[in-house]
C-alpha cells in the first residue's frame, strides 16, 4: 500500500479494510466503516439487482493492513481481477480501485475511444 494511502487508512479505520469485486474487472478496497454503509445500501437494492448484490456482497472479504502496510489479497479475488505482477491502485474518493496494470490500460483505451458518456456532457476540465 503506498504511504499516502497507508497513513490515511491506518488513522481513519485502523487499517481494517474490505475488498470486493467490481463489474469493470478490478477490485474495490473500502475502509471498513465506509464499506459497512455501502453494504447496507447494496443489500437494499431491488430484486432486479441480485446479480450485482451477489458480485459485490458475495465476494467481499475483510482484510487488514499488516505491520509493513501490505494487504494480502486471496487467490480467488486476484484471479477474478486478473491481478498479475504489475498492479495499479487508484484513489477514488471514499474507496480505492486495485487494477491489473494491463487490464486498466485496455479499459482506459476503450473508454477514451468511446468518448465521454452523455451523463458527463457538461463536465469541463
Where are these regions (language model features)?
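Short, solvent-exposed interaction modules
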Residues: 37, 43-78
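Acidic (E/D-rich), amphipathic helical modules within compact regulatory domains
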Residues: 1-40
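A short beta-strand-loop micro-motif that forms or neighbors metal/cofactor-
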Residues: 11-26, 82-99, 116
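A short, polar/proline- and glycine-enriched secondary-structure boundary/capping micro-motif
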Residues: 11, 39-42, 83-84, 108-111
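Conserved "turn/edge" positions that cap or connect secondary-structure elements
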Residues: 116, 120-125
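Positively charged
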Residues: 26-33, 97-117
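Short, structured motif recognition centered on aromatic/hydrophobic residues
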Residues: 1, 29-30, 69-73, 77, ...
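Short, surface-exposed beta-strand-loop junctions and turns on beta-sheet-rich folds
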Residues: 7, 35-37, 79-80, 104-106
Amino acid at each position: 500500500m503506498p504511504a499516502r494511502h497507508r497513513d490515511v487508512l491506518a488513522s481513519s479505520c485502523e487499517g481494517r479494510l474490505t475488498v470486493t469485486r467490481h463489474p469493470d474487472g478490478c477490485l474495490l478496497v473500502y475502509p471498513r466503516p465506509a464499506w459497512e454503509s455501502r453494504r447496507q445500501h447494496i443489500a437494499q437494492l431491488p430484486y432486479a439487482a441480485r446479480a450485482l448484490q451477489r458480485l459485490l456482497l458475495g465476494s467481499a472479504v475483510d482484510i487488514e493492513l499488516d505491520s509493513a502496510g501490505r494487504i494480502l489479497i486471496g487467490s480467488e479475488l486476484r484471479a477474478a481481477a486478473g491481478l498479475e505482477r504489475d498492479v495499479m491502485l487508484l484513489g477514488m474518493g471514499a474507496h480505492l480501485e486495485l487494477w491489473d496494470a494491463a487490464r486498466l490500460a485496455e479499459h482506459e483505451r476503450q473508454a477514451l475511444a468511446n468518448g465521454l458518456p452523455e451523463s458527463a456532457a457538461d463536465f469541463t476540465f
